[in-house]
Amino acid sequence: MFKYIGDIVKGTGTQLRSMVMVFGHGFRKRDTLQYPEEQVYLPPRYRGRIVLTRDPDGEERCVACNLCAVACPVGCISLQKAETEDGRWYPDFFRINFSRCIFCGLCEEACPTTAIQLTPDFEMADFKRQDLVYEKEDLLISGPGKNPDYNFYRVAGMAIGGKPKGAAQNEAEPINVKSLLP
């Protein structure tokens, strides 16, 4: 009989403890957000939508080197190289299939010109899969993104039209690598 009384006391204690816990949660700060009205906090290094940036001169930064497409583990990036009259490469078309993209950031790390950057934008839901395939016009933004002063062609030392490399003002002569061989 004492066993039954002990079970009743134990059950009553369990019920009271549960009621106190439920009552206490009514006065706590809620964990859920009323999303679109309340914006979600995203950490600074959040990897969201991919964009193509421009250099400080307003030209496309992408040189169509194809490193981003090679680095992509799911193969969602495709592009075709074209060349301007002065020898500068640019992508004739640049396409990202966001229905396959896993937002790993490997394309951003592989890009030598910092043309590809991941933004904290994550609202890309759509009803049709073909609407998740973004072309170059959809990806290009007007600004330089995270690196505002970087210009690949200034750093890489591209030849000026009509002058060989090393002939510009304050520019060192190019090194002949074959002369360094034994």
Swiss-Prot record:
Keywords of the record: 4Fe-4S, Cell inner membrane, Cell membrane, Iron, Iron-sulfur, Membrane, Metal-binding, NAD, Quinone, Repeat, Translocase, Ubiquinone
EC annotation from Swiss-Prot or TrEMBL: 7.1.1.-
4Fe-4S ferredoxin-type domain sequence ranges: 52-82, 92-121
Function summary: NDH-1 shuttles electrons from NADH, via FMN and iron-sulfur (Fe-S) centers, to quinones in the respiratory chain. The immediate electron acceptor for the enzyme in this species is believed to be ubiquinone. Couples the redox reaction to proton translocation (for every two electrons transferred, four hydrogen ions are translocated across the cytoplasmic membrane), and thus conserves the redox energy in a proton gradient.
Cofactor dependency: [4Fe-4S] cluster
Protein's name in the database: NADH-quinone oxidoreductase subunit I
Location, primary (coarse class): membrane
Domain of life, per lineage: Bacteria
One of the GO biological process terms: aerobic respiration
Sites where the protein binds [4Fe-4S] cluster 2: C72, C101, C104, C107
Membrane topology: Peripheral membrane protein
